[in-house]
Structure formats: structure tokens, C-alpha cells
């Protein structure tokens, strides 16, 4: 007889290697074929809903790790909710209008000016849809489960129709107006930009101090006195209309080299050295309020510059006197309006000076900086020039600097409902908590929202103009345009004449001849995505507004979170979301931003081809995503190692229950041994902790909880000593079936708990566990937390035992290093105990030699009896010696009773009994 044939060795079809790049697409094809997404919705029909609303990624370019991070977090949440008693449909979306697509089309050699706007827009739409298709394939390969056949796309007619309604509703409430005021203007995009489209980068600029000569001192200043201003935008001097001083600051008139100058008193010490005023004497001190309406002369144009009082002039930097160009700054515009100054912005859309700036016509504004400073020097007005590096606004698409430029634009008034917006922010649950403060301050401090764009690819502003110039936005026109867009798409605006866009028989008192024109500007793309609560949540029967969760990157506080809040509060009076969760950015292994120029980009598509989607997903679960996260080949290697541990744990569990049938072989909890109960309690604790972590969106906690359970509780303890039972004992022995019961519960529980994170691997485990033709793991519910008898008492006892076991393991390790023993199975452990430890061992049930994975064990009372050579800790002393007896050929345990059965001279008594009873014919 071959004794190895009497061992019950593990058997499973679950392979050690995942081969994920090849296996995952097979599972995905199966899910698609079986309509798994639809089945999940059917299973959960009638349950409470949990709606995570997808913030639409921009349909341009290859997916990056930020996309993978974002979509995987969403997918984990939706999968969790779908297994936790909720109906949680997921409708993915795309943002498809805007400049990057126009630019991409231009790069293909398309000449926009050589075709009609409608033709150009068709090319943009085609390009956007190919990008959507490419990204959709990438997201599906990542294992994202959703309604991929019916996503929402901002260029679709039904979406645009609802967006028009949002605009119409805001206009009806008086929130939409046209005005000329300074807005962020991007010469590189030739369009106005909203605050959300601005990013700050360092820029080197000329910093200049300029003298304006007083022509009318109003009895406070002598004629010819110089008021000194400071600016870092010399190109705005041609548009200067005034100087602002703070009414509550003290200003000094100083005399230096026969000239008088005015600066803020608080800044004089720093200016003495900077402007060469070391020897200057103070002639008089005046209050800023006394300088109100003093008149100075523009340095090189024949016009006045009026001195005004404004709070934005401070003594923090410069001179305390602020150069004011109402056409090129928000504060300047507001103070200019108060003092009735002209709003001069002598630049065209490309940032080139017009004839309104004599001497600089046809010059790009940035190039004009040098010309302006030379002109100031020529007329003797330039006191000082130096260069500084400062944070400056840039166009987030083109990465080029932007300017403030007054133009006629359409705005959404924020003041009209700012208090409602702030109240709505307070009513939302924010994770991380600082998100509330961030958005609250943003809403509190923001100006009106410029919603018009001077571009072609976007949703047209549905505005008509009468013959007298009056803008027409009525219920009748809005509803008509909305339905036209629903039927034909927004291109109809550019394809048809005005008369064919207006409702039949439309009249207006401002057009006695029945003539009308239409607006040519389009809407800000943030108005597009910001209308999704209306176009998607409100419009789709399976969804609802407000959503339970918006979850995006932390850049969306100024973007989608903000624009969605604005439009939703404007038309419904409440936020479109109950909870907002934000994540950080994906950086490289050294914490640097990924960029092609640095050569440090890691693309999810490439990682999936090499390692599999489940590795990318496990990486997402491993990081603290609420801050910026790091990813590199090395980090993914570490994650792959954890994946391997989890997979091997599953394989061991599956292999050792191949002859176990839960309906017939399971041992009830009350009939388990205490150590088995301990594992069931630990497993139950894991269920509670993991579910709590899912509920709190703390996926890295789950990663550590499950990894620790697989490594510490299972691999290093329970599965380790189990081999002496499940391989060796008779197939139906109580102890073996008890351990198999725990194994079965563990594999079922772990598979369900991991399903939202590792959908492909858990499906493979489930298939191996339950067999072919089984319902997907993703149609199961998560395990319930059970109430297990005596759990606190059992846990306390066995946790204490595990601490002592750690000491025994250390002693065995020491003995191995000292060459006292080879394998631990050759050892005998003698444990010297006192007090609590003695009481503990008296109360424990178990085969301690088996639990310590040694051949013999002896418990001795009295620490004082331990020999000097014993390994001592605070509670116990451990003596390691070589076990007496022979090694059993079958179980490899050293036993004194090897050969007790003469028919089986190489077997111990236990193994001989098993062989005789179960394997001898």
C-alpha cells in the first residue's frame, strides 16, 4: 500500500496563476451575453434605491490612471450597494462639447473657416463619438458594470433638449442677463472662460512703478505732485482710467530730488530703498478719503485719470495706490462703474491691440509690455522696473496665460440666489469634511457665472433678438427650441434661418417688421454637464433627483460639483446630491504629476494587458484615495503580491473542500471545536468590519482587513495546523468536517466581500466553488453579521492563546537558527506557565502540539521551574527540545507509538487506525 494514496490532498480546478489578462475578457463576454447588469437590476427591483450619478469624463484621449481610479471607486460603491439590499443602477456619461474637440479636429487639418459652422460641428460630433466608443471599451475592460448600451452623452438630442429647459427656467426666474464686464478671456482659445476653466501657473512679469501727475489737487495736493502706482501688467496702462486709494489709509506726500510723490505711509519704509527715496522728506500726511476725485493725467495719452476711493486698495504690497483699468479687472470695473468711468478694453479676441490704443495697434498684448514700459520711460513716468515670478491664471485647456477683458457676455447671476446656494451646501454630507468649507467659500466669494462662449462646438444659447436689439427668452421660444433640439439635435440652430427656428406665427413688439436675429454664442461646457441632474437624474425612470452620491476628483469642487449645484438650486431650490465624495490625483511613484514630458505616465490599458484589471482595481482599493495617490510598476508589484496571497488562500480553501457538501457535511456552530468557533467568530468580525468600511467608503481598510485575515488568521494559523487534520484524518471525521465547515464559510464569505473589488477573480472562485451554470457571485447579497454564542469569551481566550503562540513561534525560530532542530515538526514544546496563563490553558480545549505545529507538547506549572536556556516572555517560558520517537511515514509527526501496529510498522497509532478502518479492503 502507498500511504500517500491514503492522504486527502487538496484538489481544485482553480489555478494558482490568475492569467487575468486572458481570463478577464472571457468573464466579461459571459456577463454581457447573460445580460448580468440587467439581471442585477431585476434582482434588486423594489428595493430602496441608491443612486450614484456619474460625473461625465471628457470624451477626448486615452484613459489615464485618474480615470481608472475614479471609475473603479464608483464601481466598487455601486457593486457594494447592489449586494447590500439596494437597487443601484449605474448610468455612465460623457461630456462631449468644448474646445479640445475643436482643436483635435483642427489638428487633423480641418479648416474651420472654409466650411459652414453646421458642417464643422458634424465633424466634431463624429470625433466625439469615436472617443466615447474608445473610452467605453476601456472602462468595460476595467470591469466597470453599468448601462453601457444607454449612457448619457451631452451631445445627444434628448440631453440638449433638457439643458435648454434648465437655461429657460433660470432665465424665467431672472437669473440670466447680458452685460459688458471683465471676464477671464483666453486669447489662445479666442473665448471667454469661467473660473472653473482657469488654472494657476508661475509666470515671470515686469513689475513697474509709474508716476501720474496731478492736474487738479482739489486743494489737497499741489499740481504736478506724482501719485505712484504699481502694476505687473504694463500692457493695461493704455486702458488706465483712474487710480484707487483706500479711504481709511494714511498717505504721505514726500519730496525727493525736487519732485513730490504720494504713497501709502505704511509702505514708505520699503519704497525708500526700492525707488531711491532714501533722502526723501515727508511734507504732509493725508487720509485716502481726502484724495477722492483728485485728477491726474494719463502718462502718455491726453486724458484724465481720476483718483477714487475703494476698499481693494491695501497697504499689503505696491504703493497703496492702485492703477485702475475698468476694462481689465473685476475690482477696477466695479469701482469704475461707481465713478462712471469708461470701460475701455482696447484688445480684439486674439489679444491684439485695436486703434483704441494709439501707438500699439496690431501688437499682441504680451509683446506690448516692453513697448509700454519704453513709452513710460520716454515720458519720464517710469520710476522703477524689475521682473518677478508670480502665480498667474492660465487657460486650463491650452495652458496659455489668460487676461481680464471686458466684453459683452451672457451671465448667470449668482447674487440672486447665493444665500440659497450656501444653505444647500450646508445641507449636504461631504467626504472629506473639508469639501464643505471649500465649496462654501467658493460659492460665497464667486462672481456671476459667464455662460457664453465664442466658439462653434457646444449647445447654442437659445436667444433671439428683436429689431430693437431686445433679447427674447420666453416660455414659448424655450419650449419650441427644446423640442426642435429633441427632434433634430442642436445643429438645427446653425442649419436653419431664424424664421424657421421661431414658433410659427411668432410676433414681438420690438420687431414691427417681423425681423429677428439669433445669438451666435454657445454655452459654457460646465452648463452642459451641470445640467445632468435634469437631463439624466430627472429624465430617466430608473434614476431620481437628488442623487445619493456625486463622486469625483477634488478639482470638481470648482467644476462639476459647483455648476451642478448652481443650476439645480436655481431651478429646484435644492442641491442635486445628498452626499459628495472626492478623491485626489494619481501621481507617479515619487509623487510627481504624470506627464509625457517627464516620461512617467502609466496607462491603465497597458497595466491591464500585463497584469489584469483586478490588479488595477486592487491598487485602487489599497490607496487612501481621499488624498493624492501614487502608482508605479513597483507599487503594482506589491499589490500583485497581495493579490497572489489572496488567490492562494482561496485556492487552499477550495482545494480542501472538494469532498465537502454543505447540506450534508456541515457541522453546526454549537458542535464545532472551540478553535473552529474562534475562526467563525473572527470571520464574523471580518464581515462586520468590512461592511462598515464599505459603508464609509474606506476601501483601503477593507484591503488591509482582508489581507490580514488571509495572512494572519488563516495562512499563519488555522490553515497551517489544519493540514494535520484535513489531509490526515478520515474523510468523515468530526474534526475534519468541522474544519471544512469553517473553510467553506470562509471561502463563501471572502468571495462575497471581495466581489465589489475583484469582480473577475471572485466570479472564478464562485464558479469553482458552486459549479457550472450557477448564478453569478454578483447576483448574491453580502453575508449578514451573525450573533454567535459566547463570542466574547471565546475571543478573549483564544486571542490570549495566540499571543502565547507567537512566543512559541519565536522560540522555535530561535531553536532553528541555533540548529537545535530542523523543521518545527521535529520539536517538543515545554511551556512553563504561572497564574493567568495556567488558568487559560486549563480552560482551553485543543491538541496543543497540533496547534503549535510540533510533535509533542508539555505544560509545566511554575515559571521558576523553567531552565536557564528557556525562551522567556512576561507570561510564559518556552523550552524547545527534540521530540522523542520516530517520524510517522504518513503524517510526518514524531511519535513514540510509531510501529504500535505491526502490520504498519512505519505508522503512528492514529494513522494506523485510520488506514486499517478506511483503506484496508
Swiss-Prot record:
Record GO terms (molecular function): aminoacyl-tRNA deacylase activity; ATP binding; isoleucine-tRNA ligase activity; tRNA binding; zinc ion binding
Residues engaged in binding ATP: 596
GO-annotated biological processes: isoleucyl-tRNA aminoacylation
CDD domains hit by this protein: Anticodon_Ia_Ile_BEm (cd07960), IleRS_core (cd00818)
Top-level taxon: Bacteria
EC number: 6.1.1.5
SUPFAM superfamilies from the UniProt entry: Anticodon-binding domain of a subclass of class I aminoacyl-tRNA synthetases, Nucleotidylyl transferase, ValRS/IleRS/LeuRS editing domain
Extent of motif 'KMSKS' region: 593-597
Principal location listed in the UniProt entry: cytoplasm
Co-factor remark: Binds 1 zinc ion per subunit.
Catalytic activity: tRNA(Ile) + L-isoleucine + ATP = L-isoleucyl-tRNA(Ile) + AMP + diphosphate
Localization annotation: Cytoplasm
GO cellular component, one term: cytosol
Keyword field: Aminoacyl-tRNA synthetase, ATP-binding, Cytoplasm, Ligase, Metal-binding, Nucleotide-binding, Protein biosynthesis, Zinc
Motif 'HIGH' region boundaries: 57-67
Binding positions for L-isoleucyl-5'-AMP per the UniProt entry: 552
The protein's role, per its UniProt record: Catalyzes the attachment of isoleucine to tRNA(Ile). As IleRS can inadvertently accommodate and process structurally similar amino acids such as valine, to avoid such errors it has two additional distinct tRNA(Ile)-dependent editing activities. One activity is designated as 'pretransfer' editing and involves the hydrolysis of activated Val-AMP. The other activity is designated 'posttransfer' editing and involves deacylation of mischarged Val-tRNA(Ile).
Oligomer status and interactors: Monomer.
Domain notes: IleRS has two distinct active sites: one for aminoacylation and one for editing. The misactivated valine is translocated from the active site to the editing site, which sterically excludes the correctly activated isoleucine. The single editing site contains two valyl binding pockets, one specific for each substrate (Val-AMP or Val-tRNA(Ile)).
This protein's name: Isoleucine--tRNA ligase
Upper classification of the organism: Bacteria, Bacillati, Bacillota, Bacilli, Bacillales
Amino acid at each position: 500500500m502507498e500511504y500517500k494514496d491514503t492522504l486527502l490532498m487538496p484538489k481544485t480546478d482553480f489555478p494558482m496563476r490568475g492569467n487575468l489578462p486572458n481570463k478577464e475578457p472571457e468573464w466579461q463576454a459571459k456577463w454581457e451575453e447573460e445580460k448580468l447588469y440587467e439581471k442585477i437590476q431585476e434582482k434588486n427591483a423594489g428595493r430602496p434605491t441608491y443612486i450614484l450619478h456619474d460625473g461625465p469624463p471628457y470624451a477626448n484621449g486615452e484613459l489615464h490612471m485618474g480615470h481608472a481610479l475614479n471609475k473603479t471607486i464608483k464601481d466598487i460603491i455601486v457593486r457594494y450597494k447592489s449586494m447590500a439590499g439596494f437597487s443601484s443602477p449605474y448610468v455612465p456619461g460623457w461630456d462631449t462639447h468644448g474646445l479640445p474637440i475643436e482643436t483635435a479636429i483642427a489638428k487633423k487639418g480641418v479648416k474651420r473657416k472654409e466650411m459652414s459652422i453646421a458642417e464643422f460641428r458634424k465633424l466634431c460630433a463624429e470625433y466625439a463619438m469615436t472617443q466615447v466608443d474608445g473610452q467605453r471599451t476601456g472602462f468595460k475592460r476595467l470591469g466597470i458594470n453599468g448601462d453601457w448600451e444607454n449612457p448619457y452623452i451631452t451631445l445627444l438630442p434628448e440631453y440638449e433638449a433638457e439643458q435648454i429647459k434648465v437655461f429657460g427656467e433660470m432665465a424665467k426666474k431672472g437669473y440670466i442677463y447680458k452685460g459688458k464686464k471683465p471676464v477671464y478671456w483666453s486669447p489662445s482659445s479666442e473665448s471667454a472662460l469661467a473660473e472653473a476653466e482657469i488654472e494657476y501657473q508661475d509666470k515671470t512679469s515686469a513689475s513697474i512703478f509709474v508716476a501720474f501727475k496731478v492736474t487738479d489737487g482739489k486743494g489737497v495736493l499741489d499740481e504736478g505732485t506724482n501719485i505712484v502706482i504699481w502694476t505687473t501688467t504694463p500692457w493695461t496702462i493704455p486702458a488706465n482710467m483712474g487710480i484707487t486709494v483706500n479711504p481709511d489709509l494714511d498717505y504721505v506726500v514726500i519730496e525727493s530730488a525736487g519732485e513730490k510723490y504720494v504713497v501709502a505711509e505704511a509702505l514708505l519704509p520699503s519704497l525708500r530703498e526700492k525707488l531711491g527715496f532714501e533722502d526723501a522728506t515727508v511734507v504732509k500726511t493725508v487720509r485716502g478719503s481726502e484724495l477722492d476725485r483728485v485728477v491726474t493725467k494719463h502718462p502718455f495719452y491726453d486724458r484724465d485719470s481720476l483718483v477714487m476711493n475703494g476698499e481693494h486698495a491695501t497697504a499689503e504690497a505696491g504703493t497703496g495706490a492702485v492703477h485702475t483699468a475698468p476694462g481689465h479687472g473685476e475690482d477696477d470695473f466695479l469701482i469704475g462703474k461707481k465713478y462712471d468711468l469708461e470701460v475701455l478694453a482696447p484688445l480684439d479676441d486674439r489679444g491684439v491691440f485695436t486703434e483704441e490704443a494709439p501707438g500699439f495697434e496690431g501688437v499682441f498684448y504680451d509683446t506690448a509690455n516692453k513697448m509700454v514700459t519704453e513709452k513710460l520711460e520716454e515720458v519720464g513716468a517710469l520710476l522703477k522696473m524689475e521682473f518677478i515670478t508670480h502665480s498667474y491664471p492660465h487657460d486650463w485647456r491650452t495652458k496659455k496665460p489668460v487676461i481680464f477683458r471686458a466684453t459683452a457676455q451672457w451671465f448667470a447671476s449668482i447674487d440672486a440666489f447665493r444665500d440659497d446656494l450656501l444653505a444647500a451646501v450646508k445641507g449636504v454630507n461631504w467626504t472629506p469634511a473639508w469639501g464643505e468649507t471649500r465649496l462654501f467659500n467658493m460659492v460665497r466669494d464667486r462672481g456671476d457665472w459667464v455662460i457664453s462662449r465664442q466658439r462653434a462646438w457646444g449647445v447654442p444659447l437659445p436667444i433671439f433678438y428683436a429689431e430693437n436689439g431686445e433679447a427674447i427668452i420666453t416660455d414659448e421660444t424655450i419650449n419650441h427650441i427644446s423640442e426642435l433640439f429633441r427632434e433634430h439635435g442642436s445643429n438645427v440652430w446653425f442649419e436653419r434661418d431664424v424664421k424657421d427656428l421661431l414658433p410659427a406665427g411668432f410676433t414681438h413688439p420690438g420687431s414691427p417688421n417681423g425681423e429677428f436675429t439669433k445669438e451666435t454664442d454657445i454655452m459654457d461646457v460646465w452648463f452642459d454637464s451641470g445640467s445632468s441632474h435634469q437631463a439624466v437624474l430627472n429624465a430617466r425612470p430608473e434614476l431620481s433627483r437628488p442623487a445619493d452620491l456625486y463622486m469625483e476628483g477634488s478639482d470638481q469642487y470648482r467644476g462639476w460639483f459647483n455648476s451642478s449645484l448652481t443650476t439645480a438650486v436655481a431651478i429646484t431650490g435644492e442641491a442635486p446630491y445628498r452626499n459628495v465624495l472626492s478623491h485626489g490625483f494619481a501621481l507617479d511613484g515619487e509623487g510627481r504629476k504624470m506627464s509625457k514630458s517627464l516620461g512617467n505616465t502609466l496607462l491603465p490599458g497597458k497595466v491591464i494587458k500585463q497584469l489584469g484589471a483586478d490588479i488595477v482595481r486592487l491598487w485602487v482599493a489599497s490607496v487612501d484615495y481621499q488624498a493624492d495617490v501614487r502608482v508605479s510598476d513597483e507599487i503594482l508589484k506589491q499589490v500583485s503580491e497581495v493579490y497572489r496571497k489572496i488567490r492562494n488562500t482561496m485556492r487552499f480553501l477550495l482545494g480542501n473542500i472538494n469532498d465537502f457538501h454543505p447540506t450534508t457535511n456541515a457541522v453546526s456552530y454549537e458542535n464545532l471545536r472551540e478553535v473552529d468557533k474562534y475562526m467563525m467568530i473572527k470571520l464574523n468580525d471580518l464581515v462586520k468590519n468590512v461592511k462598515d468600511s464599505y459603508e464609509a467608503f474606506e476601501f483601503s481598510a477593507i484591503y488591509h482587513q482582508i489581507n490580514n485575515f488571509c495572512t494572519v488568521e488563516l495562512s499563519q494559523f488555522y490553515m497551517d495546523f489544519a493540514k494535520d487534520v484535513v489531509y490526515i484524518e478520515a474523510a468523515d471525521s468530526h474534526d475534519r468536517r468541522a474544519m471544512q465547515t469553517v473553510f467553506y464559510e470562509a471561502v463563501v464569505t471572502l468571495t462575497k466581500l471581495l466581489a465589489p473589488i475583484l469582480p473577475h477573480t471572485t466570479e472564478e472562485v464562485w464558479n469553482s466553488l458552486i459549479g457550472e451554470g450557477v448564478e453569478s457571485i454578483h447576483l448574491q447579497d453580502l453575508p449578514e453579521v451573525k450573533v454567535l454564542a459566547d463570542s466574547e469569551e471565546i475571543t478573549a481566550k483564544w486571542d490570549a492563546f495566540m499571543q502565547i503562540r507567537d512566543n512559541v513561534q519565536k522560540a522555535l525560530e530561535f531553536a532553528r537558527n541555533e540548529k537545535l532542530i530542523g523543521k518545527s515538526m521535529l520539536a517538543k514544546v515545554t511551556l512553563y506557565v504561572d497564574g493567568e496563563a495556567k488558568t487559560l490553558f486549563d480552560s482551553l480545549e485543543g491538541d496543543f502540539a497540533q496547534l503549535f505545529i510540533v510533535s509533542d507538547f508539555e505544560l509545566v506549572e511554575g515559571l521558576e521551574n523553567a531552565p536557564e536556556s528557556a525562551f522567556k516572555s512576561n507570561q510564559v517560558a518556552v523550552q524547545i527540545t527534540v521530540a522523542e520517537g520516530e517520524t510517522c511515514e504518513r503524517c510526518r509527526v514524531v511519535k513514540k507509538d510509531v510501529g504500535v501496529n505491526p502490520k504498519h510498522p512505519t505508522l503512528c497509532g492514529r494513522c494506523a487506525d485510520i488506514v486499517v478502518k478506511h483503506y484496508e479492503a
